[in-house]
């Protein structure tokens, strides 16, 4: 349940109505039917299911009770309380979340599928899900033939902020220590571009932050805590594009701070109190960033373009050293891939919040984009698909 026209809100399920329930709460059986997320493979000819990978395992879901992210950033967790309640919530994995809603990447040579997973459930509130909540908020590598887990990289153990792995992973070769390594990159909601060895899942490096960061991984409070990026900030569902010519990965992102406030519906009759975390947009400037991240130099940002609205579409890099992206105000932009100079702009009449694509037909290269707007962000809506032809 999304509450708030900005798309920043909270999800809350209640078994029955009660005084004090906030607007947007789901009442009834929906509160009892949560399910773990999964990826599944089907035979294209027969439709038969071949395998299924569940995002939350029955064994080991609690993990190691990590106090840091894999790259060493501290997490504000109550480990003692989590361990004390582990026995009480041993079955939490059954409704543990980890929704799979992003497009995977495939390496046919390694026989691996790389996919992102969503945040744990209950969303934001962590009292009933002690542990790291594996394999939520993770980039996972699955055997393409069997669906077995080869490795995982959990970007945020025990997520309390909505930092699901939303942007699709991208494959490229990275240069590290004079060596060329087959890599997979993932642009995160936390504001970093992670680059991993796609054979082992080992972290090669993370980029410089491509959006402002404030109170990252701090625990939400009853007084309210402003955190940036928020649940819809950083790189959300926007696909990344990589150019072999420039060695740069191009990331579209959003600066959208959010206030996280812990609230409680009082106990009523025989019903216990219900705690939840409300998310509210912070008053103040919000903007988008298009960042060119150098994967040959450890993730330095070579250039960055700022847009007046958060970027929630995607990026297209071409062999002609152009980078295309769309804005919420309706502009489709073309930048110089190496310098970031804005070279061309076309107003599409509605928010350009889908990734551009390119193809060649009868010797002519086309760039095509959908301009449909975005109701969640309040961008002007439309129903156009617009094609541009590049000169021969």
Describe the role of every protein-language-model region.
Residues 1, 111-112, 192, 247-248, ...:
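Generic structural signal for coil-to-beta-strand starts
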Residues 98-107, 170-178, 234-245, 315-317, ...:
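Structural signature of eukaryotic scaffold interfaces centered on beta-propeller domains
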Residues 111-115, 305:
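Anion-binding catalytic surfaces of enzymes that hydrolyze or transfer phosphate/sulfate esters
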Residues 204, 244-254:
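Membrane-proximal interfacial segments on either side of biological membranes
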Residues 2-4, 115, 186, 251, ...:
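Residue position within the beta-strands of beta-propeller blades
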Residues 11-12:
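Chalcogenol-based redox active-site neighborhoods
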Residues 15-26, 32, 39-94, 126-165, ...:
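Extracytoplasmic/lumenal domain signature
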């Amino acid at each position: 349940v999304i509450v708030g026209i900005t798309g920043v809100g909270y999800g809350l399920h209640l078994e029955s109505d009660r005084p004090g329930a906030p607007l947007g709460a789901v009442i009834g059986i929906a509160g009892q039917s949560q399910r773990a997320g999964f990826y599944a493979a089907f035979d294209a000819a027969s439709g038969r299911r071949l395998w299924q990978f569940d995002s939350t395992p029955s064994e080991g879901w609690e993990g190691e009770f990590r106090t840091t992210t894999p790259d060493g950033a501290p997490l504000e967790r109550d480990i003692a309380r989590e361990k004390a309640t582990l026995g009480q919530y041993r079955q939490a994995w059954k409704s543990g979340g980890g929704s799979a809603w992003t497009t995977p990447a495939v390496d046919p040579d390694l026989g691996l599928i790389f996919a992102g997973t969503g945040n744990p459930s209950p969303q934001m509130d962590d009292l009933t899900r002690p542990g790291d909540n594996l394999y939520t908020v993770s980039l996972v590598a699955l055997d393409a033939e069997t669906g077995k887990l080869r490795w995982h990289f959990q970007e945020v153990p025990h997520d309390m902020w909505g930092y699901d792995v939303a942007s699709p992973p991208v494959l490229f070769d990275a240069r590290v220590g004079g060596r060329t390594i087959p890599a997979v990159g993932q642009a995160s909601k936390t504001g970093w571009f992670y680059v991993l060895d796609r054979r082992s899942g080992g972290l090669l490096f993370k980029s410089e932050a491509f959006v402002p960061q404030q109170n990252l991984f701090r625990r939400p409070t009853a007084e309210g805590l402003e955190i940036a990026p928020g649940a819809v900030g950083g790189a959300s569902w926007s696909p990344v594009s990589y150019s072999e010519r420039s060695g740069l990965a191009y990331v579209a992102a959003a600066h959208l701070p959010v206030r996280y406030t812990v609230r409680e519906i009082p106990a009523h009759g025989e019903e216990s109190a219900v705690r939840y975390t409300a998310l509210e947009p912070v008053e103040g400037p919000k903007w988008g960033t298009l960042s060119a991240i150098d994967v040959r130099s450890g993730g330095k940002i070579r250039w960055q373009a700022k847009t007046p609205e958060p970027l929630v579409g995607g990026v297209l890099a071409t062999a002609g050293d152009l980078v295309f992206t769309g804005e919420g105000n309706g502009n489709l932009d073309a930048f110089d891939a190496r310098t970031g100079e804005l070279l061309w702009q076309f107003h599409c009449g509605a928010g350009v919040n889908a990734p551009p694509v390119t193809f060649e037909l009868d010797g002519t290269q086309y760039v095509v984009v959908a301009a449909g707007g975005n109701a969640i962000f309040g961008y002007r809506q439309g129903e156009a698909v617009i094609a541009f032809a590049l000169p021969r």
